Structures are given as C-alpha cells and as structure tokens.
C-alpha cells in the first residue's frame, strides 16, 4: 500500500517543481522583454529629437533662401541653436505653399486597450402577468370534403393474363354475293330420240349416173362403255406432276382450350401522384366495407345486377 502513495508523491513533487521553474523562466523572460522595450523606446526618442533638430535647421534655411539671405549653417550639437537664435530670426516671413507629399504607409497596429469597466446594472423590469389559457373549444364533428384528385400514380405491375372467354354467339348471315361470271360451255349432250318418219316427198330430179363426192363426216357417236384397266406401266424414278388442288373441306370442330400464356413484362413506372390531404377529426375512422381481393373468385362469371339495383355482393358504407 505504500508504493502507490510514494509514486503519487513523486509525481506531485515533479509537477510542482516544473510549475515553479516555468513561473521563474516566464518572469525572467518578461523582465528581459521589458528592458529591451525601454531601451528601444529611448533610442527612438533620441532619433526623433535629432530628426526634429535637423528639420528645424532645414526650415530656417528655406526661410532665409526665400528672403534672399544666406547664413552659414553650423552643426555644433544641441548648443549651437541657442548661439545663432538671434541671427535666425525671420524678418520678412513668406508663406510657403508646398504640395502635399504622398500618403505614407499605414503604421503598425497598436496594442488592444484595456477592457472598460462594467456598466451599471439596469433597473429591474416589471413583473409579468399570468395569462390564463382558454380551454380549447369543443368543435362539432365535421367531415371535411374530399380534396382535389392527385396526379397519376406510378404504373402498376402487369396483371396476370385472364382466362379464355367463352365463344360468342353465331354471327348474322352475310349479304348475298355478287353474281359470278358466265361459266364455260358445258359438254355436248346426248343425241335425242329418233323422230317419226316424215311424209314422203315428191320425186326428185333425174340424177346423172356416176360416183358421187364423199360427204362430210357425221356427228360423233355416243360415249362407249368403260374399258378394262390396262396393264401396269414401267417403274420410273421421276415422280409425276402434282395433281390439282382439291376443294376445301368443311370447317372442323373447335380444338381444346390452350394453356395460359407466360406472364408479360412489367410495365414502366407511372408518374407520382400528388400527396393526399389530411383532415384531423375525432369522429372515429371512416371505413369502407368491401370484400377482400383474396376472397374474390376470378374464375366464376360475375353476377349480373338485378333490375333496379345492385347485387348482394356490392359495396356498402359503414
């Protein structure tokens, strides 16, 4: 227990010794500075006296020159001025109008002066008056009107694609088309039945004997029956030309419902809306009772409102 106390004593003694030494050194430095300042002040006073003496002699010389006189200057120290004071009297003084010299450089800033004494304390003021606070008036319940609509809010995310809708009702029959162009001539028909023999005509003229000219070919006869199929042809490596395009068949039945497509990309964010207004009121919270979004069944067909009002699943205010 004695070791810590002895160490603290040594530290305290060293601190006191350093403090005393610092005070002594500071006192010695201040004394030396004061002596040096006194010596500098004395030298400055001596130089100022010499300067005034030289300036006075120069002034006397200027006065003598202006008065057409001249005197021999004698610089014999401070005592020579009294010996020549009678000869240097100005008999006809002339007022000199010398131009002012240039402005000298600014002097060294002086030391700040001592702080002034504190002013007299002011008179005490009047006592304040107690102002009773009026109780807040009980305002009636006022429902503030809705504020102006804000600006358009940010663009929401792209919703999921809806389900495929049911097929629509069959459309109305179309208008009759325009008459087409005249078709090509059809094939020649079959010869008609043989007619009854006619009345015997009058006898003809006598013919000249000989061989007559061959007459024109008669009309083609009727189409004969289908012949038997011929023998198979020789195999060929080249395929024949494509056949003609057949007529379009009737439309087929509707196909099965396809799978829902992938979700679309997110849309760009919209403009920020204006901040909504605020109406402080102590009438409770105005609530809107409506079914939750999670409770709505998007798969079922929405009910059609009854005639003269809304369906039972509408909105209501509380």
UniProtKB/Swiss-Prot annotation:
Pfam families: Col_cuticle_N (PF01484), Collagen (PF01391). Residues 309-318 have a biased composition (Gly residues). GO terms for molecular function: structural constituent of collagen and cuticulin-based cuticle. Keywords: Collagen, Cuticle, Disulfide bond, Repeat, Signal. One of its GO terms (biological process) is cuticle development involved in collagen and cuticulin-based cuticle molting cycle. InterPro entries: Col_cuticle_N (IPR002486), Collagen (IPR008160). Residues 101-318 are annotated as: Disordered. One of its GO terms (cellular component) is cuticular extracellular matrix. It comes from the Eukaryota. Disulfide bonds: none annotated. Residues 187-204 have a biased composition (Low complexity). Residues 101-130, 147-206, 209-235, 240-278 are annotated as: Triple-helical region. Collagen polypeptide chains are complexed within the cuticle by disulfide bonds and other types of covalent cross-links. Nematode cuticles are composed largely of collagen-like proteins. The cuticle functions both as an exoskeleton and as a barrier to protect the worm from its environment. Mutations in dpy-7 affects the body shape. Belongs to the cuticular collagen family. This is Cuticle collagen dpy-7. It comes from Caenorhabditis elegans.
């Amino acid at each position: 227990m004695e070791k810590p106390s002895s160490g603290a004593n040594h530290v305290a003694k060293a601190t006191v010794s350093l403090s005393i030494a610092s005070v002594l050194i500071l006192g010695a430095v201040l004394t030396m500075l004061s002596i040096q300042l006194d010596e500098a002040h004395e030298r400055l006073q001596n130089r100022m006296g010499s300067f005034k003496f030289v300036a006075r002699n120069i002034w006397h010389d200027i006065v003598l020159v202006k008065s057409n006189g001249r005197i021999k200057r004698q610089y014999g120290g401070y005592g020579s001025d009294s010996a020549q004071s009678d000869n240097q009297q100005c008999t006809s003084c002339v007022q000199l109008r010398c131009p002012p010299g240039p402005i000298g450089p600014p002097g060294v800033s002086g030391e700040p002066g001592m702080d002034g004494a504190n002013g007299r304390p002011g008179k005490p003021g009047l006592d304040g008056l107690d102002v009773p606070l009026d109780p807040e008036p009980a305002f009636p319940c006022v429902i503030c009107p809705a504020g102006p609509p804000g600006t358009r809010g940010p663009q929401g995310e792209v919703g999921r694609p809806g389900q495929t809708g049911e097929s629509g009702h069959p459309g109305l029959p179309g208008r009759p088309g325009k008459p087409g162009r005249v078709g090509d001539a059809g094939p020649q028909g079959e010869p008609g039945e043989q007619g009854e023999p006619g009345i015997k005509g009058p006898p003809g003229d006598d013919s000249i004997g000989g061989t007559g000219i061959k007459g024109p070919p008669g009309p083609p006869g009727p189409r004969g029956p289908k012949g038997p199929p011929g023998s198979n042809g020789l195999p060929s490596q080249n395929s024949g030309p494509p056949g003609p395009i057949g007529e379009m068949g009737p439309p087929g039945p509707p196909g099965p419902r396809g799978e829902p497509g992938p979700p679309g990309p997110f849309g760009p964010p919209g403009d920020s809306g204006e901040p909504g207004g605020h109406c402080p009121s102590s009438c409770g919270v105005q609530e809107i009772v409506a079914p939750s979004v999670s409770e709505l069944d998007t798969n079922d067909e929405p009910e059609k409102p009854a005639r003269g009002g809304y369906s039972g699943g509408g909105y209501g205010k509380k």
